[in-house]
Structure formats: structure tokens, C-alpha cells
């Protein structure tokens, strides 16, 4: 890790209180992290954003990297259909991952993951960029392109954000469906989004219970009217035996087999600031 102290060492648990002990450990940022906080005076920041919102958000946007800058921060000519950063070109995956992987931050931790069984995985920005690029190439090899929709129905694994970022990398629109949703809920979201590819796991663990995610996907896809899904990518999480389909209208693939020979280099799609990034369905709450 680039810093003298690792990211893990910066997470210091506070002294347990009776309330905290009953629920969860509370982590207090180190004094170094607090000193480097981006907002030192919340009230002053809020007043500045209210007084001059366009200038405020332009200042925030200047913290990102753009292929082309905007001609107008906010276009209000067709309310309520506002347009932000008119004419600007960017890619959120580049800003979230690539620009860090190209600097000394490539060795800093991007993710610290802990499973339900307390197993851990650590992934640096450099490693994350490599995995995102490889999966982006996997998607492209299956015909996914800019503007296409991809449904992601997975457990809480690192491959979930990798899939999301890979979609953003190539301009595909991802739709994350909560892994606890039913067959009917998943089917409805696939139909509505018109996804042609689903990314899932063989299974997931929630509160000690195994969830048959792959079986739920299978049940959602074999329906009348048929869904537009042509390909399913399965990440091996639980090790449970699942049926892999190879039919004229649908083919299933193992994540690890596709990733094995995928190139770690992938060109980033240039996106308009108003291009859609994802589709997120409310459950009605």
C-alpha cells in the first residue's frame, strides 16, 4: 500500500458502549482522516450551495476528469426536464477507477470486503481496474454495446460492483436487482428494462441461509411471454451445483471461465453527461 499505514489500520473501533455492543461495532476515523475531510464546515457548505447552486456544482464537477467540458452547467429551458453539464463528455468508471489506477493510488485499497462467514478480500485500485477491464471485454465478446441493458442479480460479492463498473466502462446500462427479490419481481424488471444479459451467482448467503439465485433466474427466464435474455453469466459463489443451459435462444457461462482469457486492456467509452448510467426500480416504498 502506498501509505505508511494501511487502509485497514486507519479503521479504529471506538470503545464499546452498551448500545453499540448490542448491535454493531462503531468505527471512528483516525485523526489523520478527520484532518483531511473534504468538508470542514457543513453549514457553510450548505449555505454556499443554496446561494449559488450552479457555481457550487461546477466547482464539484471540476474535481472530476472530463473528455470535453460543458457549455452550460444547468439548462432549465424545458422544465422539469433539466439537463446538467450540457455538451460535456465523461465516463464515470474512468473517474471512479481508472484515474486512480494510473497514479500512486493504484496500490491503495479500493475495496475491503468481508463475507458473512467473516472471510475477507482486499482489492487495490490497480487490481480493480484490471478486473473491470476484463469483465468489460467479456461483455463486449457477448455482443453488449453502448446503450444495451444488463440485469445484475447477485449476492454481496466484489464481483457485483465489478460488473456495474464494467457496464459503465463500455456505456451499457446496468439494472441491479436486489438478491432477495422473488422470481416475479426479477422477471418484471428484466422485461421492463429489456435486458439481453443477466449476471448472477450460483447462490448467495443471507443471515446464514443459502439463496438459490441461479434457480430464481432460471425460473424468471422460462416464462410466457419470453424474456429478451440471450446470455447468463454465473459467478461461482456458493459452490452449489446448478444447471447450465446451452440452447439456441440462451446460453449460460461461468464467470471464471470467461475471465480466464479476457484481455486486461479495454477502451473506455466516451459518454455524454446526460447518457443514462443505470436503471433502478423502486419497490414502492
Locate predicted features.
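Short, contiguous pre-domain boundary segments
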Residues: 19-44
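Conserved pre-ATP/AMP-binding loop-to-beta segment of ANL
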Residues: 107-109, 230-235, 246-281
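Conserved G/P- and acidic residue-centered "switch" motifs that form tight phosphate/ATP-binding loops
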Residues: 150, 171, 285
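Structural core segment of the AMP-binding/adenylate-forming
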Residues: 165, 169-257
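Conserved AMP-binding/adenylate-forming core of the ANL superfamily
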Residues: 93-94, 107-165, 182, 186-187, ...
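Active-site diphosphate/adenylate-binding microenvironment
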Residues: 67-89, 156
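A short N-terminal helical cap/helix-turn-helix that marks the beginning
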Residues: 48-71, 88-110
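Conserved adenylation A10 loop of the ANL superfamily
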Residues: 118, 279-285
Amino acid at each position: 500500500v502506498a501509505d505508511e499505514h494501511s487502509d485497514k489500520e486507519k479503521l479504529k473501533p471506538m470503545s464499546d458502549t452498551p448500545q453499540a455492543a448490542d448491535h454493531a461495532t462503531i468505527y471512528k476515523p483516525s485523526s489523520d482522516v478527520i484532518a483531511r475531510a473534504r468538508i470542514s464546515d457543513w453549514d457553510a457548505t450548505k449555505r454556499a450551495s443554496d446561494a449559488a447552486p450552479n457555481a457550487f456544482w461546477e466547482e464539484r464537477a471540476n474535481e472530476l476528469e472530463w473528455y470535453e467540458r460543458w457549455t452550460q452547467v444547468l439548462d432549465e429551458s424545458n422544465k422539469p426536464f433539466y439537463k446538467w453539464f450540457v455538451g460535456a463528455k465523461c465516463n464515470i468508471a474512468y473517474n471512479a477507477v481508472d484515474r486512480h489506477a494510473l497514479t500512486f493510488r493504484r496500490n491503495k485499497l479500493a475495496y475491503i470486503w468481508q463475507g458473512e462467514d467473516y472471510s475477507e478480500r482486499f482489492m487495490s485500485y490497480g487490481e480493480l481496474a484490471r478486473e473491470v477491464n476484463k469483465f468489460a471485454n467479456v461483455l463486449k465478446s457477448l455482443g453488449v454495446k453502448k446503450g444495451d441493458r444488463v440485469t445484475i442479480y447477485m449476492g454481496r460479492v466484489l464481483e457485483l460492483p465489478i460488473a456495474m463498473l464494467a457496464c459503465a466502462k463500455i456505456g451499457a446500462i446496468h439494472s441491479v436487482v436486489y438478491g432477495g427479490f422473488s422470481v416475479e419481481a426479477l422477471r418484471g424488471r428484466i422485461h421492463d428494462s429489456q435486458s439481453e444479459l443477466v449476471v448472477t451467482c450460483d447462490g448467495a448467503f443471507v443471515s446464514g441461509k443459502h439463496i438459490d439465485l441461479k434457480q430464481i433466474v432460471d425460473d424468471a427466464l422460462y416464462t410466457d411471454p419470453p424474456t429478451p435474455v440471450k446470455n447468463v453469466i454465473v459467478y461461482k459463489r456458493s459452490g452449489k451445483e446448478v444447471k447450465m443451459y446451452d440452447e439456441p435462444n440462451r446460453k449460460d457461462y461461468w464467470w471464471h471461465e470467461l475471465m480466464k482469457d479476457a484481455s486486461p486492456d479495454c477502451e473506455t467509452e466516451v459518454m455524454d453527461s446526460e447518457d443514462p448510467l443505470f436503471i433502478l426500480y423502486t419497490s414502492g416504498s
